[in-house]
A protein has these predicted regions:
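Bacterial N-terminal signal peptides
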Residues: 2-10
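Transmembrane beta-barrel domains of Gram-negative outer membranes and organellar outer membranes
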Residues: 15-235
Length: 235
């Protein structure tokens, strides 16, 4: 196994940019999205110092229940190593229920990640996405399993669960709280975020944003993780 693969397995596999996102179960038919998101650790400890990652993706919802998404570039700088591109990903969101049809709205996520780091395995991810809206308050839960595949793969499943609770002051301002837990490395984090959407006048286009900071709940998590996301949507 190369040094790069070892670093990916021992540090990068514990947290990637797609670990710090709470996926929505909703699909908007015919909408195209271009998204950039990432994170940066703010922790002087050697196993977290200068760690950061980012990824850019494009998606298009061909129908009202399926949204495929391609991650064109996934960048990572693991603590103690140089930054590099680490692979690509094909992700699918399936909306399983109509919004408001049942007590909660349900979707499903399924993805395949191809790693370009020599000696590192690919991975599949899957799991349910659940959202409950009550008035202006929305709560979203993700339950995601990850399994390494192909050469060098571990036989174990890794599990993470995520939570987002936001209050809609206006379309452009939704303050809230996000929480993340990864049982594979016992890292638990939670903190405030602000999100929103701006409609571009006289168009069918929108610009979404999300920024926040996660605080480490236990010693296995970074003390602070800064998050940022921007998304351009159009029909």
């Amino acid at each position: 196994m190369t040094l790069g693969a070892a670093l990916l397995l021992t540090t990068g596999a514990a947290a990637q940019a797609d670990d710090f996102i709470v996926y929505s179960p909703y699909v908007t038919a015919t909408q195209t999205e271009i998204e950039l998101r990432g994170y940066r650790y703010d922790d002087a400890r050697a196993n977290f110092k200068d760690g950061n990652a980012a990824e850019v993706s494009i998606s298009h919802a061909f129908i009202d229940w399926w949204k495929p998404e391609i991650y064109l570039a996934k960048y990572e700088r693991a603590p103690g190593s140089a930054g590099r591109l680490i692979g690509y990903e094909f992700e699918n969101t399936f909306q399983l229920t109509q919004q408001g049809e049942y007590w909660a709205d349900v979707g499903f996520l399924a993805s395949y990640e191809h790693t370009t780091v020599a000696g590192a395995p690919d991975a599949v991810e899957f799991g349910p996405l659940v959202e409950k809206t009550t008035g202006r308050f929305a709560q979203t839960f993700n339950f995601i399993w990850e399994k390494q595949v192909r050469a060098g793969a571990s036989g174990k499943y890794e599990f993470r669960y995520t939570y987002s609770g936001t209050y809609t002051v206006s379309a452009a301002l939704r303050p809230g709280l996000e929480a993340y837990a990864r049982s594979s490395d016992h890292a638990y984090q939670a903190g405030p975020i602000v999100a929103g959407e701006w409609h571009i006048p006289s168009t069918t286009r929108n610009l979404e944003y999300r920024v926040g900071v996660l605080l480490g709940v236990n010693a296995m998590a970074p003390r602070r993780t800064w998050l940022a996301q921007v998304e351009y949507e159009f029909f």
